[in-house]
């Protein structure tokens, strides 16, 4: 998927210059004059990262980040804050609140592009991890109650005979359940199963 850098700044000249900078590097952008405008269209499937001015009329950058994190849609793309004022406490607070980076204006063009590309790469990794977790959860949900019991005991390290004794079932039945668990979970062996759960 091709991601877009979304820029929120109440200063039109900065929005335009950042849009031009990213476009000159072949990176798609979309600009917003206010955080409320972005929120009105959220969630944005193409959002790879957000570049937010810290101080804006109406909703500040940190307030916009808080609003996005409070939304039920889930994963918020990485946020890069821009500020015209060196404010170490605000930078620390923003990073603790989940910002990807904090950049002081004026900034080096290559530096802001590199940070945005790193943010997009981090977001792609987080999306891939979330999709993998969802796939494992869906596979786990496909297990019968007995298969789920057998899987839990397999993950405890019990052998088929021990599982059979614990559950009061035949060892051959355990072998069938074990085989089904591995097949449904898409695991070749117990080590694969342990890695995905």
UniProtKB/Swiss-Prot annotation:
PANTHER family: DNA-BINDING TRANSCRIPTIONAL ACTIVATOR DEVR_DOSR (PTHR44688:SF16). One of its GO terms (molecular function) is DNA binding. PROSITE patterns: HTH_LUXR_1, HTH_LUXR_2, RESPONSE_REGULATORY. Keywords: Activator, Cytoplasm, DNA-binding, Phosphoprotein, Transcription, Transcription regulation, Two-component regulatory system. Residues 136-197 form the HTH luxR-type domain. One of its GO terms (biological process) is regulation of DNA-templated transcription. The keyword Hydrolase does not apply. CDD domains: LuxR_C_like, REC_FixJ. It is found in: Cytoplasm. The keyword Phosphoprotein applies. It comes from Rhodobacter capsulatus (Rhodopseudomonas capsulata). This is C4-dicarboxylate transport transcriptional regulatory protein DctR. InterPro entries: CheY-like_superfamily (IPR011006), Sig_transdc_resp-reg_receiver (IPR001789), Tscrpt_reg_LuxR_C (IPR000792), WH-like_DNA-bd_sf (IPR036388). It holds the Pfam family Response_reg. Residues 128-135 are annotated as: Inter-domain linker. Residues 4-120 form the Response regulatory domain. GO terms for cellular component: cytoplasm. The lineage of its organism: Bacteria, Pseudomonadati, Pseudomonadota, Alphaproteobacteria, Rhodobacterales. Phosphorylated by DctS. Residues 160-179 bind DNA. Gene3D superfamilies: 3.40.50.2300, Winged helix-like DNA-binding domain superfamily/Winged helix DNA-binding domain (1.10.10.10). The gene is dctR. Member of the two-component regulatory system DctS/DctR involved in the transport of C4-dicarboxylates. DctR functions as a transcriptional repressor of genes for C4-dicarboxylate transport. It comes from the Bacteria.
């Amino acid at each position: 998927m091709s991601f877009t850098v979304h820029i929120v700044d109440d200063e039109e000249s900065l929005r335009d210059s950042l849009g031009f900078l990213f476009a000159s590097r072949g990176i798609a952008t979309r600009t917003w004059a206010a955080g409320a405008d972005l929120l009105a269209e959220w969630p944005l499937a193409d959002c790879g990262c957000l570049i937010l001015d810290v101080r804006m009329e109406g909703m500040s950058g940190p307030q916009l980040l808080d609003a996005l994190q409070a939304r039920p849609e889930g994963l918020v793309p990485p946020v890069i804050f821009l500020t015209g004022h060196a404010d170490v406490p605000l930078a620390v607070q923003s990073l603790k609140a989940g910002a990807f980076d904090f950049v002081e204006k004026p900034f080096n063009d290559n530096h802001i592009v590199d940070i945005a590309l790193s943010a997009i790469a981090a977001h792609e990794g987080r999306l891939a991890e979330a999709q993998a977790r969802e796939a494992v959860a869906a596979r786990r949900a496909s297990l019968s109650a007995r298969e789920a019991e057998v899987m839990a005991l397999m993950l405890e390290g019990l052998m088929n005979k021990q599982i059979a004794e614990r559950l009061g079932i035949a060892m051959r039945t355990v072998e069938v359940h074990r085989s089904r668990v591995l097949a449904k979970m898409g695991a070749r062996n117990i080590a694969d199963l342990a890695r995905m759960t």
